[in-house]
Amino acid sequence: VHRRRAPNRSETPVLLPDQVNTILDGCSVQSPSGEWTGSEAGLRDRLFFAVLAETGMRIGEALSLRHNDFHITGGETPSILVAGRDDHPHGVRAKSGARRIYIGDDLVALYSEYVWQLIGWAADVAVADLASHFVFVNLARGQRYAPLRPETVYDKVDALTAAHADVLPQDWTPHWLRHTHATALLLSGVPEHVVMRRLGHADVQTTLSIYGWVTADAEMRTVAQWNSFVAGWKVSHDSTP
């Protein structure tokens, strides 16, 4: 992991692509037969961290997502609409205003697998209106299909860290995936104003004040194949919802 060099406190902690993949695979992997490994919550957890990595969302924004925020049909570029909600029962909220984030085919396929898993468990019967219900819900404990608590996410972070102590930093948090998203895009040559829009920043200066250092850091440019990491993402200049 690349950490800020003291005494400079302006650099953000970043996960390397291999570390992100360790997080995803540590949740669940798909077997050759198409089955997903791990617990019932494994696929949900993989989707959650994949959403953070590919979209740069904050944890509150991801936990606040509804199924009808995923726009993956109709022939248009697949996207997720991030709405400025504050109605999550566990107090998390989307800090930024509404924006549309375009996503790649792999994330679309992962989300679709998760939805089919929910339907296979009759979630569409148990929940009055699944389309408007929260995407990330309880599966392993608590009231089934109730909105997921942030504490559950952090419990998973702790479990992944313990299981992969040789790969993952001991102090990583879900927010590091947001930093990684921005870093990967900037080092892949994506314009700063596009990164700004995907992150939901009010102006490009905010983006530059947080992440401007990465483009001038020679080590960060060579420490990973950033272009390959973002190759499947759909990055668009149009962020209008």
Model features per residue range: what roles?
Residues S28, S64-Y111, I119, A123-D124:
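Conserved tyrosine-mediated DNA breakage-rejoining catalytic core shared by Y-recombinases
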Residues V51-S64, S188-V190, H201:
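A short, glycine-centered helix-capping/turn motif at helix boundaries
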Residues V1-C27, L139-R144:
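Flexible interdomain linker/hinge and immediately adjacent N-terminus
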Residues D18, T22-I59:
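Basic, Lys/Arg- and aromatic-enriched nucleic-acid-binding interface segment
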Residues R9, H90-E113, H133-V157:
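C-terminal catalytic core of Y-nucleophile DNA break-rejoin enzymes
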